């Protein structure tokens, strides 16, 4: 029985980087006889232009039917002034929520070949391997009520709400504990329990659940301290689990420890490990169409798709190994280039990975 993969290139550099990831998918599909069927649709600004909505109903239906979704990136300045409900980012938030993709896995892994690309000293980041588990469908980005109004004194005022219920907290913490159990058995739960009621509940639930994972060492850290510690001594972390907004910020920060956000994939999973896979970076409209974007994060997202979504562990390993081979050869896109390396564009980098496979 064939596996169905829905490809959503999105906006900006999305089409360029996804094209290279599709090359890799098609190559391993044939070579390893994986029997995958690929189909394409629009999300974000591209969907707004095509369907009048950042996520069309028919696209959502196709995503539900697919075994996995591969996404490029969404957003662009040309949609900044339209109705907020129709902006590209709302399509991304909606598809995550409608598919129940509550667990976002973002690895921050430093390839040894790129130690010099990090903004931190090589000895600080050498061997870095962190997994950030971010809650994706609750909290501030989805909380109600939200909106804007004119206050009693005539000022413009805007407001958001940060709610979390116990079941939402428990299911993401379970993912964090399970991932820590598979890795270094250390879990750091990041919150703001000294200020936020939602974080106080989060910390309480984490402490209760720790009793079910005696082999995992649980620690707690306030988000402001976690941001500082990620820069000061990032290798103290193994798995970090946190709520939606904190995870959004910390995972982008962690990405730069590796030298470039263009290297980092992500997986967003539901309760049955069905998910959507995408690079951690955005649509980068400033370089769209120039052929210089780094496709490796999207290619590595394909590896995560095969690993978590399809169970093709050896094929996923082969893709990750091929990326290492390409980096060993000295090929670099502009974002990870350094003196003595060979600068290549998006297509050449994708071709090199396929050749290494």
From Swiss-Prot:
Quaternary context: Homodimer.
Cofactor binding annotation: Binds 1 Mg(2+) or Mn(2+) ion per subunit.
Chain sites annotated for binding substrate: 96, 106, 134, 224
Pathway participation: Amino-acid biosynthesis; L-leucine biosynthesis; L-leucine from 3-methyl-2-oxobutanoate: step 3/4
Keyword Transcription assigned: no
Protein's recorded name: 3-isopropylmalate dehydrogenase
GO molecular function, one term: magnesium ion binding
Subcellular location field: Cytoplasm
Source species taxonomy: Bacteria, Pseudomonadati, Pseudomonadota, Gammaproteobacteria, Lysobacterales
Function: Catalyzes the oxidation of 3-carboxy-2-hydroxy-4-methylpentanoate (3-isopropylmalate) to 3-carboxy-4-methyl-2-oxopentanoate. The product decarboxylates to 4-methyl-2 oxopentanoate.
Catalytic activity: (2R,3S)-3-isopropylmalate + NAD(+) = 4-methyl-2-oxopentanoate + CO2 + NADH
GO biological process: L-leucine biosynthetic process
PROSITE patterns: IDH_IMDH (PS00470)
Site label Important for catalysis, positions: 141, 192
Gene: leuB
Record keywords: Amino-acid biosynthesis, Branched-chain amino acid biosynthesis, Cytoplasm, Leucine biosynthesis, Magnesium, Manganese, Metal-binding, NAD, Oxidoreductase
EC number: 1.1.1.85
Disulphide bridges, residue numbers: none
Source organism (scientific name): Xylella fastidiosa (strain Temecula1 / ATCC 700964)
Residue numbers binding Mg(2+): 224, 248, 252
Cofactor(s) demanded: Mg(2+); Mn(2+)
Binding locations of NAD(+): 76-89, 282-294
Enzyme class: oxidoreductase
Family: Belongs to the isocitrate and isopropylmalate dehydrogenases family. LeuB type 1 subfamily.
Residues forming coiled coils: none
InterPro entries: IsoCit/isopropylmalate_DH_CS, IsoPropMal-DH-like_dom, Isopropylmalate_DH
